[in-house]
Amino acid sequence: MEARDKQVLRSLRLELGAEVLVEGLVLQYLYQEGILTENHIQEINAQTTGLRKTMLLLDILPSRGPKAFDTFLDSLQEFPWVREKLKKAREEAMTDLPAGDRLTGIPSHILNSSPSDRQINQLAQRLGPEWEPMVLSLGLSQTDIYRCKANHPHNVQSQVVEAFIRWRQRFGKQATFQSLHNGLRAVEVDPSLLLHMLE
C-alpha cells in the first residue's frame, strides 16, 4: 500500500472504527479478492467488539500489497458514505505531496519541473551501476543504453548523462523530478540524492 493511502487510513482511523465496517460483507470480499487470509479473518473475528475488529482490519490492510486500498474501497458497497469519505481524503492527499516526497523536502513546483543539464550531470556523478535499471524504469530501452555506451565507451558518467538527456527529450514535460524520485525508489536508491542536484 502506498504511503499516501496508509496516511489516509491512519487519519480516518477513529471515524472508520466508529462505523464498525466488519459487520457486513467487507471481510468476505477482502478474503475473496486475496487481500485477507483465512488466518486474518479468524484473528479479526476473535476480537470482542466491532470497534476492535475494525481497528485490527485497519492494522492489517497497509501490509497487504498495492491493491489493498482500492480493494478496500470496493468492499465498502454497504457503506457508500464511508467510501466517499476515503476517496475524498485520498484526493486531498494527492494534492498534497505524497509522504515519500515529503521525505526529500522538495517543493511540488520543482517536483513537476524537468532537470537541467547541470542537474543531470550532478545526478550522473552520484549514481553507480544502478543507473541502468533506473533509466529502464523511466522508460528507456536496452537499445538506448547500448547506444549511450557505444557513444562513450570509456566514460561511464557521459553514458549516464546521455541516457538521462535522452529520457528528458523523449518524455518532455513528463520527464520531471517526480519521475526521477520514483525511479530512484524503484531501484532502492535513497531519493534524497535529488536534494544534491538542487544545491
UniProtKB/Swiss-Prot annotation:
Alphabetically ordered keywords of this record: Apoptosis, Cytoplasm, Disease variant, Intellectual disability, Lissencephaly, Nucleus
A Pfam family recorded for this sequence: CARD
Keyword match Cytoplasm: yes
Outcome (variant: E188K): No effect on interaction with PIDD1
Mutagenesis or variant effect for Y146A: Loss of interaction with PIDD1. Decreased PIDDosome assembly. Decreased CASP2 activation
CDD domains named in the record: CARD_RAIDD, Death_RAIDD
Source taxon at top rank: Eukaryota
Domain remark in the UniProt entry: The Death domain mediates the interaction with PIDD1 and the formation of a complex composed of 5 PIDD1 and 7 CRADD proteins which in turn probably recruit 7 CASP2 to form the PIDDosome. The Death domain mediates a direct interaction with the Death domain of RIPK1.
Role according to the record: Adapter protein that associates with PIDD1 and the caspase CASP2 to form the PIDDosome, a complex that activates CASP2 and triggers apoptosis. Also recruits CASP2 to the TNFR-1 signaling complex through its interaction with RIPK1 and TRADD and may play a role in the tumor necrosis factor-mediated signaling pathway.
Disease with which this protein is associated in UniProt: Intellectual developmental disorder, autosomal recessive 34, with variant lissencephaly: A disorder characterized by mild to moderate intellectual disability, megalencephaly or enlarged head circumference, and a mild variant of lissencephaly with anterior-predominant pachygyria with shallow and unusually wide sulci and mildly thickened cortex. Some patients may have seizures.
Protein name per UniProt: Death domain-containing protein CRADD
Gene behind the chain: CRADD
